[in-house]
Amino acid sequence: MGMKKSRPRRGSLAFSPRKRAKKLVPKIRSWPADKKVGLQAFPVYKAGTTHALLIENNPKSPNNGQEVFTPVTVLETPDVTVAGIRLYEKTTKGLKALTEVWAEQLDNDLGRKLTLVKKEEKKTADALDAVLEKATEVRVIVHTNPKTTGIPKKKPEVVEIRIGGSSVAERLAYAKEILGKTLAISDVFEAGEIIDTLAITKGKGFQGSVKRWGIKVQFGKHQRKGVGRHTGSIGPWRPRRVMWTVPLPGQMGFHQRTEYNKRILKLGSEGAEITPKGGFLNYGAVKNGYVVVKGTVQGPAKRLVVLRGSVRAAEDKFGLPEVAYISTESKQGN
């Protein structure tokens, strides 16, 4: 593809306004149409990146049967606790919460994040059955357990996760079964599965137009006057305002982004077998279970990442490639 005649910017306007995300926990706005009963997402923490050697299993590839170098991301997966159940009704204005029920025993650390419901005010499971006919969606409220990881904090993150299934009654029965229990990553996903990753990206702060939008650096008299990295024109005399489409300096990074169709290469329960010598940079050792995802995942180390079942997965023609080697060499340059 040749150079465009007009290229006012490199970035997409679809992501505007490019401002900081309100919360570190990403919003999940869509879910896969999965008839399998179970959770459709799982929150994890990003530990770091390394590389692996995979055996190419595409018969049409020139590297078929050979080892191929690929970057991989390691995510720590401490068990999550199911704290509550919430039912929704579909209305003309979107989903409307009908009722919610909380577990009898709640973790004290959850009180650092939410105002816990008093014991005498808690609803029973009968409140769920009373509105079952109206309900169209069943979700569970889960919280992470960061105190079991190397991340220096006790306050958990709270995520609302949809339960998949063919009927509402079937989903509700599963939700009642897991209420108050802890779930592992192996209860939701398995090796070889295609997933989406949702997270808040690395924050870059206030950046100029060249870095933020990829505009052209001006030379000649513009550079001599010290305005080589400025926007050439910010618009005409009329209308007497600057349009929102003009590439201007501002916030870069710390936005919510979704990356689609990532493959899970490996699931494990012993973090020591995946931790590199000296630990991951800015993270340390993996103390719980882990998941290895092919490619990169947005966000810095220690960032919460939500793994969701793929909403637009294509046909998986070749399946899970054989993992010949995962590097655990030091990432500190030693």
Curated annotation (Swiss-Prot):
A single BP term in Gene Ontology: translation
SUPFAM superfamilies the record matches: Translation proteins (SSF50447)
Family matches, as PROSITE patterns: RIBOSOMAL_L3
Keywords noted in UniProt: Ribonucleoprotein, Ribosomal protein, RNA-binding, rRNA-binding
Keyword RNA-binding: yes
Location of region: Disordered: 1-20
Biased composition (Basic residues): 1-10
A single MF term (Gene Ontology): structural constituent of ribosome
InterPro entries in the cross-refs: L3_arc_euk (IPR045077), Ribosomal_L3_dom_3_arc_sf (IPR044892), Ribosomal_uL3 (IPR000597), Ribosomal_uL3_arc (IPR019928), Ribosomal_uL3_CS (IPR019926), Transl_B-barrel_sf (IPR009000)
One Pfam family from the record: Ribosomal_L3
GO cellular component, one term: cytosolic large ribosomal subunit
UniProt function note: One of the primary rRNA binding proteins, it binds directly near the 3'-end of the 23S rRNA, where it nucleates assembly of the 50S subunit.
Subunit structure: Part of the 50S ribosomal subunit. Forms a cluster with proteins L14 and L24e.
Family the UniProt entry places it in: Belongs to the universal ribosomal protein uL3 family.
NCBIfam families referenced in this protein's UniProt entry, alphabetically: L3_arch, PRK04231.1
Protein name: Large ribosomal subunit protein uL3
